[in-house]
Amino acid sequence: MLDSIKQKKNSKRIKMRIKTGDLVKVINGKEKGKTGEVLKTIPLENRVVVKGINLRTKHVKPTQEGESGRILTEEASLHASNVMFFSKDKNIVSKIEFFIDKEGVKKRKLKKTGELID
């Protein structure tokens, strides 16, 4: 247990092009073709949590007397390589590239169309 925690702390942070709040489309796996908003990114594991996708049920035991158990449904993480940025305006998926504009600000744009994201 302790070794796995140390390993995660010592592992390199992976640079992710997808950010929290982006609209993504699942391109691989059992949820293929579905779209959703990114709720959370986990850079150390290169994973993302997408709203309404990859749902898992969790059975929770009662913690106090008189309380009944519950069944919770929550989103599990997906590997970042299984999702792509989805443009709602153009209705396409595309890779993301970074560039620096004339003012020296780092921005993101779609590789297919050149549409600015940030």
From Swiss-Prot:
Short name of any one Pfam family annotated for the protein: ribosomal_L24
Keywords carried by this UniProt record: Ribonucleoprotein, Ribosomal protein, RNA-binding, rRNA-binding
GO annotation, biological process: translation
Listed InterPro entries: KOW (IPR005824), Rib_uL2_dom2 (IPR014722), Ribosomal_uL24 (IPR003256), Ribosomal_uL24_CS (IPR005825), Ribosomal_uL24_KOW (IPR041988), Translation_prot_SH3-like_sf (IPR008991)
Keyword Ribosomal protein: yes
Entry keyword Transferase: no
GO-annotated molecular function: rRNA binding; structural constituent of ribosome
Name of the featured protein: Large ribosomal subunit protein uL24
Name of encoding gene: rplX
